[in-house]
Amino acid sequence: MEYKIVNLSQKPEILDRAARWFHEKWEVPLEAYRESMEESLLKKAPVPQWYLALKDSEIIGGMGVIENDFHHRKDLAPNVCAVYTEADYRNHGVAGALLDYVCRDMKEKGIDTLYLITDHTSFYERYGWEFYCMVQGDGEPQMSRMYIHRG
């Protein structure tokens, strides 16, 4: 299966479509995605960044890098967020390829350490991530797993 991974800055014309795609997957307000993506295009700082896996023009996967993914440990930053692969494309290495691309891209931008929150217990280890600690999500009753990736 052929697909291409891009930073949104390489295809700014799909910003609105990308914001809607993430909004539909995660139910975070559309405007929050749009604002973060617009900020990423200004290139004033390495964070935020948004990445997409594209099969032709279809978005089949994506993720972002933001300062804080809605948790109380503001010192654990930046965070990979909104990791999602369309169901028809799971188990084809899309998320792993996105993670590798994001880690390399952020390292080129001077950021060696990334964090992410997940409920998954074995997926991210395959890609060099390590369990770091439990964190309290904003408004969440349960603690969540925080992973770290050191470049």
Predicted feature residues:
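Short amphipathic alpha-helix that is part of the acyltransferase structural core
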Residues: 1-37, 45, 50, 54, ...
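Conserved active-site alpha-helix within GNAT-family acetyltransferase domains
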Residues: 108, 112, 118-142
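Short coil/turn motifs at secondary-structure junctions
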Residues: 68-70, 88, 121
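Conserved beta-strand in the GNAT
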Residues: 52, 58-68, 79, 84
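Conserved acetyl-CoA-binding loop-helix of GNAT-fold acetyltransferases
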Residues: 85, 91-104
